[in-house]
C-alpha cells in the first residue's frame, strides 16, 4: 500500500492569507499495483474530510473510514485541512488542491480521474460541500487559474458523500463551526458559507445521510441541502 503523508504546500501569502499552525496534509491509502502481471484497476478515489468543528480532526472519521473504503474497492486519501485560527477560504483551497493533485497522480496511483469523490463528516462535510458547490464560483476562480494553473473542472468532485454535514448558517446552524471558520469576518461571510444557498446546476450529485436524533448538527442541515439540490 502507498501510505504517505503529503504536505499541502500552497503560497498562502500570495493568496492574501496569513496561515498559522500546522500545515494541511493528505494521507494516502492506495492499494498496491502489480503492473507486470495485472492490468490497472483504475479504482475510484475517495478524499475524506474528518469533522471536528474546524477546531480538530476527529480520528474516528479519518483512517477508520479510509480503511473501510479500501475494503470496498476504493483508494482513499484523508485530507487534514487547516483548522482555526485559519479561516475560510483556506480550507476550500486545500480541498481543491487535493482533488487536482489526485487527478495529476491518477496513473501513478491507479485511480480513475473521472471518479474522484469528496467525502466529509460534520464540519468536514462543510469542507466537502463547499468545494462541491463553489468549484466554479468566484471564491475559486483566481485560485484555480493563478495558483494551480488549471481550469475549474480540474477541481470539481465527481460526487459528494456527506455524513451529518454542517451546511446552514441560519436557524439550524452548528454555530461553533462557523465561529471557528470565519471568526474575524463573521458578519461579512456568514451568508456566503451557508451552502444550501450555493447550490447550482453544476453542483455534483451527493449521497447525504443524517440521523434525526443528532444532538450536535441538526438534521435540518442535510434536509436543506437535499431540498436545494432537488430543485
Which stretches of residues belong to each language-model region?
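Short amphipathic alpha-helix adjacent to the substrate-entry channel of hydrolases
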Residues: 40, 58-77
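Primarily recognizes the serine-hydrolase "nucleophile elbow" in alpha/beta-hydrolase
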Residues: 100-177, 190-191
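Short beta-strand element of the alpha/beta-hydrolase
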Residues: 42-51
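Catalytic nucleophile-loop/oxyanion-hole region of alpha/beta-hydrolase
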Residues: 57-59, 64, 79-113
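N-terminal cap/lid segment of alpha/beta-hydrolase-fold proteins
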Residues: 1-42, 89, 171-175, 200
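Active-site nucleophile elbow and catalytic-triad environment of alpha/beta-hydrolase enzymes
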Residues: 32, 146-150, 183-204
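Short beta-strand/loop motif that positions the catalytic acidic residue
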Residues: 202, 207-210, 214
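Conserved alpha/beta-hydrolase "acid-adjacent" motif
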Residues: 215-224
Amino acid at each position: 500500500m502507498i501510505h504517505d503523508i503529503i504536505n499541502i504546500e500552497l503560497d498562502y501569502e500570495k493568496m492574501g492569507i496569513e496561515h498559522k499552525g500546522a500545515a494541511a496534509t493528505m494521507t494516502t491509502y492506495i492499494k498496491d499495483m502489480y503492473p507486470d502481471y495485472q492490468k490497472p484497476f483504475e479504482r475510484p478515489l475517495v478524499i475524506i474530510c474528518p469533522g471536528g468543528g474546524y477546531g480538530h480532526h476527529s480520528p474516528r472519521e479519518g483512517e477508520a473510514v479510509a480503511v473501510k473504503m479500501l475494503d470496498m474497492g476504493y483508494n482513499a486519501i484523508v485530507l487534514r485541512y487547516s483548522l482555526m485560527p485559519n479561516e475560510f477560504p483556506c480550507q476550500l483551497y486545500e480541498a481543491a488542491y487535493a482533488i487536482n493533485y489526485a487527478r495529476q497522480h491518477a496513473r501513478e496511483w491507479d485511480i480513475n480521474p473521472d471518479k474522484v469523490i469528496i467525502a466529509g463528516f460534520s464540519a468536514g462535510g462543510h469542507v466537502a460541500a463547499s468545494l462541491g458547490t463553489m468549484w466554479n464560483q468566484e471564491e475559486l476562480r483566481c485560485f484555480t487559474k493563478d495558483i494551480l494553473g488549471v481550469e475549474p473542472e480540474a477541481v470539481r468532485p465527481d460526487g459528494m458523500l456527506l455524513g451529518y454535514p454542517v451546511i446552514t448558517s441560519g436557524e439550524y446552524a452548528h454555530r461553533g463551526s462557523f465561529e471557528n471558520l470565519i471568526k474575524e469576518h463573521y458578519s461579512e461571510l456568514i451568508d456566503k458559507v451557508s451552502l444550501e444557498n450555493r447550490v447550482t446546476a453544476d453542483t455534483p450529485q451527493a449521497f447525504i445521510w443524517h440521523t434525526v436524533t443528532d444532538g450536535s448538527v441538526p438534521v435540518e442541515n442535510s434536509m436543506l441541502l437535499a431540498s436545494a439540490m432537488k430543485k
